[in-house]
Amino acid sequence: MLQQESRIRVADNSGAKEVLLIRVLGGKKYAYIGDTIIVSIKEAIAGSSVKKGQLYKAVVVRTKKKIRRKDGSYIRFDDNACVLLTNTGEMKGTRILGPVSRELRDKEYTKIVSLATEVL
């Protein structure tokens, strides 16, 4: 459960390390796994294609807040993380770092699921 001004890790190799959540798209107050958000880069690797202060769309792939699955089980992660997207909706990076949630497959982010090292 992420809200405006939340700081989030970046789970891809785009060059950004940490972002600030500016807006949750879709008229919602909080962002959960699979939601699209607008972020500002707060910390980036020197020499990368992304620079501090740039705005990007992103999709949430991990949250500390536990989410309930249809079978009644719950899942939560150790950190809040997102993957940066381009203006066309494609992934900015080429690799996904860390585990991602299975719920992304239901929300049509199959490329993120296929590139992830671990799907929980």
UniProtKB/Swiss-Prot annotation:
InterPro entries: Ribosomal_uL14 (IPR000218), Ribosomal_uL14_bac-type (IPR005745), Ribosomal_uL14_CS (IPR019972), Ribosomal_uL14_sf (IPR036853). The keyword Ribonucleoprotein applies. GO terms for cellular component: cytosolic large ribosomal subunit. GO terms for biological process: translation. Keywords: Ribonucleoprotein, Ribosomal protein, RNA-binding, rRNA-binding. Transmembrane segments: none annotated. One of its GO terms (molecular function) is large ribosomal subunit rRNA binding. SMART domains: Ribosomal_L14. CDD domains: Ribosomal_uL14 (cd00337). It comes from the Bacteria. Pfam families: Ribosomal_L14 (PF00238). Belongs to the universal ribosomal protein uL14 family. Part of the 50S ribosomal subunit. Forms a cluster with proteins L3 and L19. In the 70S ribosome, L14 and L19 interact and together make contacts with the 16S rRNA in bridges B5 and B8. Binds to 23S rRNA. Forms part of two intersubunit bridges in the 70S ribosome. This is Large ribosomal subunit protein uL14. The gene is rplN.
